[in-house]
Amino acid sequence: MSRRTDRQTDRQTGLIKLIQYVFGYVWLPLSKISIPFRGEYITKSGSTAGDIPVILGGQEPAYYIDKCNHTGEIVVVARSGVSAGFVSYWDEPIFVTDGFGYESNSEWVTTKYLFYILKNKENELNSMKRGAGVPHISGAALSEVKFPVPSLKEQERIVSILDRFDTLCNDISEGLPAEIEARQKQYEYYRDKLLSFKELKP
């Protein structure tokens, strides 16, 4: 990379951080705040059974094999089919196949915050699928979707609150159905509130 390009990048980064400081957040495309990880083609019949979940595109692992193609934190967006746009978070070894994986660009976002802002747009992502037969989401279109990015400190605060609600919802799985539903609605309400940012107009 040339010095000129370096200076341009530094100026862009400085401007973005200035806007973030003045307004409290800035809108950035997914391509700016994440590092893409594309899944690999695999078949169950051509694999050896194991305990590594295969993320095929549904809301649950498709099956389990003996090898992984990613370790550490990652957010996966299902690429095709009925569940296209479904967002999941993983912090264990997995094998990503029919899905878009996104690691966080740590300069801008934490992985868990990236998960929550994508999860909050799940319906919008699902509506982006195109094509006859088995519809799919375009990776190029997905990379252009913009998200609100506050400071890393504010992200940690938001994630801390949403994590507590998520834990609470999961921990009362033995409770009454009405209580579970009420907690889930409360969680979704606060998630929407915490992740609601106005568009910045020039």
Locations of the language-model features?
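Charged, alpha-helix-forming regions
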Residues: 1-202
